[in-house]
Amino acid sequence: MPQGLSEGVKSLTKENIMKKVILTGDRPTGRLHVGHYVGSLKERVRLQNTGEYDEIFIMIADAQALTDNADNPEKVRQNILQVALDYLACGLDPNKVHIFIQSMVPQLTELSFYYQNLVTVSRLQRNPTVKSEIQMRNFEASIPVGFFCYPISQAADITAFKATTVPAGEDQKPMIEQCCEIVHKFNSVYGETLVEPEIVLPQNAACLRLPGIDGKAKMSKSLGNCIYLSEEPEDIEKKVKSMFTDPNHLRVQDPGKVEGNPVFIYLDAFCRPEHFAEFWPEYQNLDEVKAHYQRGGLGDMKVKKFLNSVMQAELEPIRTRRVGAAPARGGRDPEGGQRLRRKDRCRHAGRGAQGHAHRLLRER
C-alpha cells in the first residue's frame, strides 16, 4: 500500500466527516422484482425524499455481476438498462440521487485491490452470505476468485464514497459487518481515515426478505420464483394464483397456517388499511383475515384474489412510469441504452462518482 494513500484519505475524511452519505445498489442480472422493491427500493425512495442526507449514490453493479456471469457479459450489459428503468419507475429521482454504473468508476477496482491485503481467505469463508450464495450457485467445487472476494469489492464501493448509511436487506448484514472489519483494520494501520457504515433495514419487518412464490426461502431471479416489477397484470395474477400456501389446508373448512405462509407474508408486506374498503369490505383489517383463515372456513383462492388486487394496485403506477421512461424502440436508437443514460444523467453521475473515488486515492 503506497504510504501517501493514508495522508490523502485522512485529509479528505477530515473535511467531510460530518456528511451523511448513502451508498446502495443492485446487480444488473435481470429486471428487479418485488423482493427488491419491499426490501430496499421503497426505503431508498423514502430516504431520498426526507432531505436528511447530503448525498445518495445508487450503483448499478455491473462489474460485480460479472463475478458469476463471466461467460455471459451480454446479459449483464443488457440488464443495465432494465435496472435503470426499474429505478426510475419506483420513484428514484436523478435530480436528487447519483445513479451510476460501477464499471465507469475504475478507482473502485484499485481500492478493492488494496483491501484484499487486509482480509484472509478463512474470513471470507466464514461469511454466511458468501457461504449461502456459493451453495445456491453450486460453486462449492470451483469458486470463481472474483465471486469469492466480492465482499471486499462491496467494501470498496461503500468506503470510496464515505458512505455512512447502506439501505439493504437482512441478508446483507454480514457484508456490512465485514466492511466494518476492513474499515477498522485499515484505520488501525493508516490512522482514522475511513468511515464505518451502518445498515438500514426496511421499517416493515415483513419486508426483510420475501420468499419466492414457490415457498423457497429466497426470491431469486435465478430460481425463477419472482414477481417482477414490470410484469403484465395477467402474469402477476397467474403467479399469485400459483403461490405456495399451507400444504395441509386442503379444504376450505380446514384450519390454515398463517406463519410461514407466503401469501400472508406478501400481504404483510403490501397490504394497507385502505385496501380492505376497496377490495374486501367484508373485513376491516388483515388480522381478521388471518383469524378466519386459522380457524377454518376461508379458502386460499379468496385470499389470493385479495392479494392479487393489492399487488396490482401497488405495481400499476410503477409499470406506468417504467413505460414512460423507456426509450422508443426502433428508429435511431435501436438499443435504447445510450439515450436513457443521457436522459437520466447516468454518464454525468458516473463522472461525479469517479471524482469522489479519485479524491480518495489522489495522494498515493
Placement of each model-derived feature along the sequence:
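Structured ligand/cofactor/substrate-binding pocket environments in proteins
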Residues: 32-41, 56-57, 62, 71-76, ...
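A short secondary-structure junction signal
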Residues: 126-127, 163, 191, 222
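N-terminal Rossmann-like or analogous alpha/beta NTP/dinucleotide-binding catalytic cores
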Residues: 19-156, 274, 310-315, 319-320
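Conserved nucleotide- and phosphate/pyrophosphate-binding catalytic cores
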Residues: 174, 180-364
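Short amphipathic alpha-helical interaction patches enriched in hydrophobic/aromatic residues
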Residues: 67, 71, 163, 248-251, ...
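Short, Lys/Arg-enriched N-terminal segments with co-localized hydrophobic residues
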Residues: 6-17
